[in-house]
Structure formats: structure tokens, C-alpha cells
């Protein structure tokens, strides 16, 4: 499935080989220094999150079970990245939310095939933020994801594919 996605579904052949964790450089330093990638809930509790990248409005309406998991995207260039990337004056941030800011964005890449074999890993076809999307697990469910939409990078189908560009992989442990 991953090979087929690399060869036939993604505009960038290496994207389907990885799971992408999006964060700010200050958080990346913390992650690399500790050797651990924490869920939002654990990072907040342990006070290891230097920059709160996400919109408070979005986090407040996201299920606590989701923020208790480590989250990855199937691809870069997500709508979240578009809204939050780069230093922005607070008045220009997503819905005026001061937290929705990633001054120096960093993606940490993880081997997707290995990640998917870990116990408890699930994935969704769209974002887990807000009310969240249905989560799946297993090879059969993975094969049914709409990778043509998940990896689509065109403007022609943007209204259809935008939510799929947020597709996520979640791991239950930090």
C-alpha cells in the first residue's frame, strides 16, 4: 500500500513513506533533548511544551482522548500548517488566537510502516481535531483510506480534499 501510494497517489514520492509530526523548533529541541515525543496532554502536564502551536479554540473542542495521544500527519502542507506557520502578529493569527502560531516550523519524520505496526496505533481519513473523525486500525482499514485525496496537492479539488489533507495517525503512548 505504501509503495503504491509513493508510485501512484502522491505528488511527492517520499511522502507516503513517513508519518509527520509538526511542531515549532523550540518544541523540537525539547523532543530531541529528552528523546521522547509526548502527547499534548503529557507535554502540558510535564511542562515540556515550549510553544503551544495550536489554536486554543480547536483544542478546547477536541476530545480529551485525542489530546492524550501522540499525533502525526500522513503528509506535510496541511491546512493547520498553512494557518499557523511562521511568526504572525496576534491580530493575524487563526481566528485571532494567540496560540495558533508556529514561528519556526519543524517536521519530525517517522517510518510510517514501522509506526503502523506498533500496538494501539490508529488512523483517520480526516482530522481528529474538533469532534474528530472515525478512527481505524489494521491493514484492511488502512487500504480503504482515500489516499488520492489525502495526498492531493492540487487547487482544483481543494474544497473536496482539504479535510483529507488533515488525515492523522495517533499513537496511544508518549
Which stretches of residues belong to each language-model region?
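Active-site-proximal loop/hinge segments that shape catalytic or ion-binding/gating pockets
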Residues: 1-174
Amino acid at each position: 500500500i505504501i509503495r503504491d501510494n509513493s508510485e501512484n497517489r502522491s505528488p511527492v514520492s517520499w511522502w507516503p513513506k513517513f508519518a509527520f509530526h509538526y511542531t515549532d523548533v523550540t518544541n523540537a529541541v525539547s523532543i530531541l533533548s529528552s528523546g521522547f515525543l509526548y502527547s499534548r496532554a503529557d507535554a502540558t502536564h510535564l511542562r515540556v511544551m515550549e510553544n503551544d502551536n495550536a489554536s486554543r479554540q480547536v483544542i478546547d473542542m477536541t476530545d480529551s482522548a485525542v489530546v492524550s495521544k501522540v499525533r502525526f500527519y500522513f503528509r506535510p502542507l496541511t491546512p493547520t500548517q498553512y494557518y499557523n506557520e511562521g511568526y504572525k502578529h496576534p491580530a493575524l493569527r487563526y481566528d485571532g488566537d494567540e496560540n495558533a502560531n508556529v514561528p519556526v516550523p519543524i517536521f519530525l519524520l517517522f517510518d510510517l510502516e514501522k509506526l503502523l505496526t506498533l500496538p494501539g496505533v490508529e488512523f483517520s481519513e480526516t482530522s481528529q481535531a474538533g469532534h474528530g473523525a472515525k478512527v481505524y486500525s489494521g491493514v484492511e482499514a488502512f487500504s480503504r483510506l482515500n489516499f488520492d485525496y489525502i495526498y492531493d496537492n492540487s487547487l482544483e479539488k481543494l474544497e473536496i480534499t482539504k479535510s483529507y489533507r488533515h488525515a492523522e495517525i495517533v499513537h496511544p503512548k508518549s
